[in-house]
A protein has these predicted regions:
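Extracellular/periplasmic, surface-exposed regions of secreted and cell-surface proteins
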Residues: 1-220, 367, 371-450
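Glycine-rich, aromatic-lined ligand/substrate-binding cores of catalytic
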Residues: 285-321
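Conserved SET/PR-domain catalytic core that frames the SAM/AdoMet-binding pocket
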Residues: 187, 280, 290-304, 385-390
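Phosphate-sensing "switch" segment of ASCE/P-loop ATPases
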Residues: 220-222, 303, 329
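Extracytoplasmic gating/loop element in the C-terminal half of outer-membrane beta-barrel translocons
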Residues: 17, 314-407
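Conserved small-residue
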Residues: 159, 178-287, 348
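Short helix/loop capping segments that flank catalytic or ligand/cofactor-binding pockets
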Residues: 69, 228, 239-240, 308-310, ...
Length: 450
């Protein structure tokens, strides 16, 4: 720190982990940050037209971080017991190597660049911080199961394979003020994030439709945790319609009215071929990673009465309910109200019902429950995370009872959420329903200080 104008900070990390082999046990992860408080320069202070700017700092940083979030000793080849084999009339006890390992595994590295500024205006009345970040992760620790043929008879342990990039903007704005006996503050944040898979390394498997990835939720050029499935156009409203629709017998052996109509997107020649199949007709549908995240904190106080509120939300994110959460009669389970009310009714057929024809679905999936935009949901939401109202008795009253401070308060945590998701399900948790929901909690309390 030189004269509160020029700032420099650096960190040098040399970390070791027993989860990597001897030759790659250690990793070196440096970082540095610089800042320039231009508002402390003489030419800035002497310019009266800039008096409204109380503080202005430009900043930049660069750094590397390592990740060792894997199991213990994944690089070691071990024999697993219980690999028994019949020999004649006897069952012989056996052991075998069931996992292919990588003896050269090492630290996963993430490199980050960050540029931005911090500012304060009118002596703290308003603040604004903005930054742009570029983050790239190399040598991702991952199990590329799709890179190994099942004929091998072995699974794959973690190895360094794949690269990923995240870029985005972060904004923070704050305002605080006093008006008579009222003091208040408002702080908001907003971020834009773009995630992209650059490579899966040995997991780069080219699909017949030209996309390169693991065939399920990781593809080069797309975000992580993506939904990969079919485009649809409602359901069949008559059995005669089935004959006029592209052949989708590879998905539904015998389509009938009430079944989902899957679109024919492409074929071996790059154009629709009159058939719907998993090799050419699956596309990117959306991602579980939010593109936008935001938050708002509010606070106010008036003569002992105080109020605070925290709001949080995301947008530009997709969700999909599966299993017990999304499918009626799943594993001989229940039928939810929205499924019953929105299901296809053969007596009153609709092209775009909320649910296709009712049928029992196994625990795995059914013909009408394949990943598709029919089941895709907008998982954006705004949630009131916390709200608290309190009152502190005046000291002239509490001191008579020998109490220095007495405050009563009521708090509500997660009291309400605004979203377009299925009623009763939390858009923040993409699941098949086997989880405890986020609870709403209401509390009354007393703070007593002598």
């Amino acid at each position: 720190n030189y004269a509160e104008r020029y700032l420099f900070e650096s960190t040098l990390r040399y970390d070791g982990s027993s989860r990597f082999p001897k030759n790659n046990k250690y990793g070196f992860f440096p970082s540095l940050a610089v800042g320039w408080r231009i508002s402390e320069e003489d030419f800035f202070k002497e310019n009266q037209s800039l008096d409204w700017i109380s503080n202005l700092k430009f900043k930049a940083s660069w750094g590397k971080l390592g990740n060792q979030n894997i199991g213990n000793y994944p690089w070691q080849t071990v024999f697993n017991l219980g690999q028994n084999y019949p020999y004649g009339d006897n069952l012989m006890l056996g052991a075998a190597v069931t996992t292919a390992t990588d003896p050269t595994i090492k630290w996963e590295e993430t490199e980050t660049y960050d540029f931005g500024f911090e500012s304060v205006f009118w002596n703290g009345l308003l603040s604004l911080n903005t930054s742009y970040f570029w983050r790239k992760t190399d040598d991702i620790l991952y199990k590329p199961s799709g890179s190994v043929s099942s004929v091998l008879g072995q699974t794959v342990s973690e190895m360094n394979t794949g690269r990923m990039k995240n870029t985005g903007w972060e904004f923070e704005i704050g305002h605080r003020n006093n008006i008579g006996s009222i003091s208040y503050n408002v702080n908001a944040n907003f971020s834009i994030i773009k995630n992209k898979v650059l490579s899966l390394g040995v997991g780069n498997v080219e699909q017949l439709n030209g996309m390169v990835g693991n065939g399920s939720d990781l593809f080069i050029g797309f975000p992580m945790e993506m939904y990969y499935g079919y485009l649809t156009d409602g359901v069949f409203i008559s059995n005669e319609e089935v004959k006029e629709w592209p052949d989708q017998s590879q998905l539904i052996p015998q389509s009938q009215k009430g079944d989902i109509r899957y679109k024919d997107i492409s074929g071996p020649d790059g154009i629709p071929d009159g058939k719907v199949d998993p090799n050419y007709d699956r596309v990117y549908l959306g991602s579980r990673i939010p593109k936008y995240t935001f938050g708002l904190n509010l606070g106010a106080e008036y003569k002992g009465l105080d109020l605070s509120m925290q709001i949080q939300g995301v947008a530009g994110v997709s969700g999909m309910l599966e299993g017990f959460a999304g499918w009626a009669l799943c594993g001989e389970g229940n039928v939810q109200k929205w499924q019953d009310e929105g299901r296809f009714d053969p007596n009153n057929p609709k092209r775009y019902p909320s649910y296709p024809r009712m049928q029992e679905v196994s625990g795995a999936a059914g013909f009408n429950t394949l990943p598709s935009d029919f089941w895709l949901l907008d998982a954006s939401y705004i949630r009131l995370k916390n709200i608290q109202l309190g009152y502190t008795l005046p000291t002239k009253i509490t001191t008579k009872a020998g109490i220095s401070r007495l405050r009563f308060y009521v708090t509500a945590e997660n009291p309400c959420t605004w979203n377009k998701y299925r009623k009763g399900w939390d858009p923040e948790i993409n699941s098949d329903g086997r989880y405890y929901p986020i609870l709403s909690t209401y509390t009354f309390g007393v703070n007593l200080k002598f």
